Amino acid sequence: MTATETVRVRFCPSPTGTPHVGLVRTALFNWAYARHTGGTFVFRIEDTDAQRDSEESYLALLDALRWLGLDWDEGPEVGGPYGPYRQSQRAEIYRDVLARLLAAGEAYHAFSTPEEVEARHVAAGRNPKLGYDNFDRHLTDAQRAAYLAEGRQPVVRLRMPDDDLAWNDLVRGPVTFAAGSVPDFALTRASGDPLYTLVNPCDDALMKITHVLRGEDLLPSTPRQLALHQALIRIGVAERIPKFAHLPTVLGEGTKKLSKRDPQSNLFAHRDRGFIPEGLLNYLALLGWSIADDHDLFGLDEMVAAFDVADVNSSPARFDQKKADALNAEHIRMLDVGDFTVRLRDHLDTHGHHIALDEAAFAAAAELVQTRIVVLGDAWELLKFFNDDQYVIDPKAAAKELGPDGAAVLDAALAALTSVTDWTAPLIEAALKDALIEGLALKPRKAFSPIRVAATGTTVSPPLFESLELLGRDRSMQRLRAARQLVGHA
């Protein structure tokens, strides 16, 4: 690649199932590399498997990238000079490339059935599971005609080179597959429909992709891609062979690869819990890369400025939910209060949770919990006591704080609060401290815990005095009186 050529990377998922974090990590690294180099991020949909692909999954991919803020320069709904960007709409392009490969002798029709290939291996004393034996390379015109007369439908196979296939992986260094270790492989089904093995490198060539950043699990297919790129160059379809970088595997529990069945692999499960994009992307960036030692907390702009695929680690990366949670909590704390309030309201609305506070009071309540939550979903448990239909005193909290000692506290609190003229947190605090800490000589925990349980129903809540202010005089006093009735007479 010359100095004047622009980096072009691609993210090309298949629209099956729900987006998972390993897939998103791949998208993030491609996006960050494009942004770091001033290059182009191409989003392409590999939807050639009609039985597995779904429109629902396609829309989920769009939703995922948009939620995360990983904008694409070319692709669905954006367009670009090398469209269409859905492989299901590129059938004519693949047919033309196949015809040119066949005409140039780079590919050939193969009629052998899997059973015939296995039988030939057994007859020759070879392992029957070796795979295709390149038998059809040497068929005569008469043999091909005979097979066609039988009604056989051939696949198209690429003629693999007789040399070693090697590349300098940007993550793993030099990789070599010995000559003859990869057999001629199918480019089409017997129906003539193109396979991933054709369309993926073909589109990379036609879309002028310069760097392929993808998961380590795809490394064994790279020799086939190299061979096809070489053939595409010879027939004038491709200009170059892209540089490859195979990203480290993401592990789940133990040493197993994180699979779609693992709960933490589901991107939308993290969103539903209340992860914010900044927190999740920060953590995913650390799955195989680091910005610097002892510097795990950073934003996307900082990542883009520092990211180079050459710095990606080749060792497997383990998904650590606790660390992901901790980083998300930090990013929540870093949000502007107004921004946090909007995001919290949206999250609660999405999950059917309404807090019975007006806009100003909700903003104040949001600020109270911003430093006390790990994910947005945690806020509901802290704030739902503002709703009378959600307010209930937890029996364990009552047993702990609303015993005989609680009666005197509540009596003194009710008397003190009755005289508060302006129902604000500072005046509420002053009145309660004077009555309970000075008047009853109680330590703060003993003084305020019964009031917290009475007002919020639990031992864990936002700051007490601010909560009482937002709850309002009438509801606060009503709840304290009701709790006093529970205690009975001192």
Swiss-Prot record:
Catalysed reactions listed for this entry: tRNA(Glu) + L-glutamate + ATP = L-glutamyl-tRNA(Glu) + AMP + diphosphate
Where, per UniProt, does this protein localize?
Cytoplasm
Instruction: Please provide the record's keywords in A-Z order.
Output: Aminoacyl-tRNA synthetase, ATP-binding, Cytoplasm, Ligase, Nucleotide-binding, Protein biosynthesis
User: Motif 'HIGH' region at which residues?
Assistant: 13-23
InterPro entries tied to this protein? aa-tRNA-synth_I_cd-bd (IPR045462), aa-tRNA-synth_I_codon-bd_sub2 (IPR020751), aa_tRNA-synth_I_cd-bd_sf (IPR008925), Glu-tRNA-ligase_bac/mito (IPR004527), Glu-tRNA-synth_I_codon-bd_sub1 (IPR020752), Glu/Gln-tRNA-synth (IPR000924), Glu/Gln-tRNA-synth_Ib_cat-dom (IPR020058), Glu_tRNA_lig_a-bdl (IPR020061)
The first-level EC class reads: ligase
Please give the biological process terms from Gene Ontology that the record holds: glutamyl-tRNA aminoacylation
Per the record, its GO cellular-component terms are: cytosol; plasma membrane
Coiled-coil stretches are: none
Return the Gene3D superfamilies for the record: 1.10.10.350, Glutamate-tRNA synthetase, class I, anticodon-binding domain 1, Glutamyl-trna Synthetase, Domain 2, Glutamyl-tRNA Synthetase, Domain 3, HUPs
Q: Where does ATP bind?
A: K260
Q: Could you cite one Gene Ontology molecular function of this protein? A: zinc ion binding
> What highest taxon heads this organism's lineage?
Bacteria
| UniProt-listed Pfam families | Anticodon_2, tRNA-synt_1c
Show where the record puts the motif 'KMSKS' region: 257-261
EC identifiers of the protein:
6.1.1.17
Question: Which family is it part of?
Answer: Belongs to the class-I aminoacyl-tRNA synthetase family. Glutamate--tRNA ligase type 1 subfamily.
**Database matches in PANTHER family:** GLUTAMATE--TRNA LIGASE, GLUTAMATE--TRNA LIGASE, MITOCHONDRIAL-RELATED
User: According to its UniProt entry, what is the function of this protein?
Assistant: Catalyzes the attachment of glutamate to tRNA(Glu) in a two-step reaction: glutamate is first activated by ATP to form Glu-AMP and then transferred to the acceptor end of tRNA(Glu).
Subunit organization: Monomer.
Q: What else is on record for this protein?
A: Was identified as a high-confidence drug target.
Please report the name of this protein according to its UniProt entry: Glutamate--tRNA ligase
Gene for this chain: gltX
